Amino acid sequence: LVIVPSRELALQIDNVLRKIAAGIKIVCCYGGHSVREESKSLAVAPALIVGTPGRIADHIRRGRIVLETLDTLVLDEFDKCLALGFQDEMQEIIAPLKNVKKKILTSATDSESLPAFTALKKPVKLNFLGSRKDNETTPTDRLSLYRIDSPIKDKLETLLALLHNLKPGLTLIFCNQRESVDRVRQFLTDRGIIAEAFHGGMGQADRERALCKFRNHSSYICISTDLAARGLDIPEVKYIVHYHLPVDFESFTHRNGRTARMHAEGEAFIILGPTEQMPEYATEATDFRIDPKADFLQTPPMATFHFAAGKKEKISKGDIVGFLTQKGKLAADEIGLIEIKDHYSYVAVTRDK
């Protein structure tokens, strides 16, 4: 049983497991997904269950998960899973797991203490934070941190100027409130800039579509709450922008962890208002000079098509490629990332087509 704090992380882990564990039954359970489909899949005990605390607790409450056969529990991003907002569900999940022989807790940030209900007996800690082999760099080494001062409390114009100064690349902008995410996105959209919003107040399909368009380069910009800070593996994120200051060092670490991945380099920018002070954990940031004449903003190279059919309708990537090449007269190299969900699919194609 693998527990994760967000739907997107559950889907990501489910996708990876299906690639490396072909032939093994896996069930993914999360809010916004069909309870009926999950219940049907759980009727015959799977080898792996991946899910979010609320949905897993609900299935356990209703007797849909066979607890006697569970022998391994994994808490990914455990410090978040065990935070106050999830503790009731987590206690409800862990308490009846009498036959679990192994508990594995993973995160990029440590936790000073663990709730008693985790019932860890003589835990062994493996700490890879900051460790390296000879001649090997860590993500922190490959991350350049910059400071930008906004002359007024409203940072929108400063953000816009920064975006014009960045060469094309995937850019994650972090805000502390959902309303701010929507406001920043609307500001950019009103100026003809393609940008996606991503936060917990959006419907599941809208969240999946936003991440898909960001991953497949239909949008270079995604504005998000800290929902996007943990665990999500979005390749090639070049820039992190802290529109709002992180609430703490852990948030800062997880936000920045979306870039400088897999030996790539990344850049993070902190925008400070007139009365804001740089946090102690970011005092090494270098001042970034805005060039008012710079204009590197470009329209993304891809656009996303939506197909109203997915896995449950037996649609494959080959079906979509065949349709686009035969009916749409597209060349194979004009088709980008294809993502097939349960009942719908997304495909990126070159925008000029």
Where are these regions (language model features)?
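Conserved nucleic-acid-binding Ia/Ib motif block in the N-terminal RecA-like helicase ATPase lobe
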Residues: 1-61, 69-72, 182-200, 209
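Post-DEXD/H (motif II) to motif III coupling segment of the RecA-like Helicase ATP-binding lobe
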Residues: 15, 19-20, 65-137, 276, ...
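Hydrophobic residues in beta-strands of the RecA-like P-loop NTPase core, especially within AAA+ ATPase
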Residues: 50-51, 75, 224, 234, ...
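Short regulatory helix/loop adjacent to the ATP-binding pocket of P-loop NTPases
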Residues: 62-65, 112-122, 185, 227, ...
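A short beta-strand element within the Helicase C-terminal
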Residues: 69, 230-245, 267-271
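Conserved interdomain hinge at the start of the Helicase C-terminal
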Residues: 141-189, 329
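Conserved segment of the helicase C-terminal RecA-like domain
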Residues: 248-289
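Non-catalytic terminal extensions of ATP-dependent helicases
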Residues: 291-353
